[in-house]
Amino acid sequence: MAANKERTFIMVKPDGVQRGLVGKIIERFEQKGFKLVALKFTWASKELLEKHYADLSARPFFPGLVNYMNSGPVVPMVWEGLNVVKTGRQMLGATNPADSLPGTIRGDFCIQVGRNIIHGSDAVESAEKEIALWFNEKELVTWTPAAKDWIYE
């Protein structure tokens, strides 16, 4: 996959949806120059969430995390672009909002780690796994934005 075709999985969590932050989050990724290739508005089942967070299943906070993520609708998305996984994580800010810098999504919009409004893949491999878990191949839209020549050399 070409470097500017890298994909990441980003999901607005229930608190981000309830607070009306979906548009602001999408706007930040669009303004950066990343391309949206998939988006859903859904209420995730506990089974799906348990698969998504399987690597955390032994942690004491796991049941609470699954319940929180199942407490309202979420907005899973797939974004594409050059170094989108790394840059996306930087845009999100630290997992704990108290450690997030102003200008990051978490630094600007949240206070506590238990309500940190957004998830982002931490590596290309986890992005591929998460994208396959939440979207089927037909839901990933291939298109060319008119602005691409103004973003990439």
UniProtKB/Swiss-Prot annotation:
Annotated Gene3D superfamilies: Nucleoside diphosphate kinase-like domain
Cellular component, GO annotation: microtubule; mitochondrion; nuclear microtubule; plasma membrane
UniProt catalytic activity: a 2'-deoxyribonucleoside 5'-diphosphate + ATP = a 2'-deoxyribonucleoside 5'-triphosphate + ADP; a ribonucleoside 5'-diphosphate + ATP = a ribonucleoside 5'-triphosphate + ADP
Source taxon at top rank: Eukaryota
GO biological process, one term: ribonucleoside triphosphate biosynthetic process
Location relative to the cell: Cytoplasm; Cytoplasm, Cytoskeleton
Residue(s) carrying Phosphoserine: 126
Protein keywords: Acetylation, ATP-binding, Cytoplasm, Cytoskeleton, Kinase, Magnesium, Metal-binding, Microtubule, Nucleotide metabolism, Nucleotide-binding, Phosphoprotein, Transferase
Binding residue positions for ATP: 13, 61, 89, 95, 106, 116
Record carries keyword 4Fe-4S: no
Known EC number: 2.7.4.6
Active-site residues per Swiss-Prot or TrEMBL entry: 119
Subunit structure comment from the entry: Homohexamer.
Cited function: Major role in the synthesis of nucleoside triphosphates other than ATP. The ATP gamma phosphate is transferred to the NDP beta phosphate via a ping-pong mechanism, using a phosphorylated active-site intermediate.
Recorded family membership: Belongs to the NDK family.
Protein name: Nucleoside diphosphate kinase
Organism: Drosophila melanogaster
Gene coding for it: awd
